[in-house]
Amino acid sequence: MAGQLKSKIVAVAVAAVVVVASSLVGTASAADAPAPAPTSGATATAAAAPAFAAVSVAAAALGGYLFC
């Protein structure tokens, strides 16, 4: 029982690290990138960041479910 609890805590911690790391990578790449031209493509780039974070969280949750 204690082993299962420990593995679930580790899985949640790994998921949190993935979310924080993806957030930091997104912030760093946005800061390094040149400002986008004011076109319709700029909104597509802005919408991709939350989608990437959602996919990261979903992948971490699936990994936690499969391996715990």
UniProtKB/Swiss-Prot annotation:
One of its GO terms (cellular component) is vacuole. It is found in: Vacuole, Aleurone grain membrane. The keyword Magnesium does not apply. Transmembrane segments: none annotated. The keyword Membrane applies. A lipid is attached at residue 40 (GPI-anchor amidated serine). Keywords: Glycoprotein, GPI-anchor, Hydroxylation, Lipoprotein, Membrane, Proteoglycan, Signal, Vacuole. Expressed in roots, stems, flowers and seeds. Residues 41-68 form a propeptide. O-glycosylated on hydroxyprolines; noncontiguous hydroxylproline residues are glycosylated with arabinogalactan. Residues 1-30 form the signal peptide. It is a lipid-anchor; GPI-anchor. Its main location: membrane. Belongs to the AG-peptide AGP family. Proteoglycan that seems to be implicated in diverse developmental roles such as differentiation, cell-cell recognition, embryogenesis and programmed cell death. This is Arabinogalactan peptide 1. It comes from Oryza sativa subsp. japonica. The gene is AGPEP1.
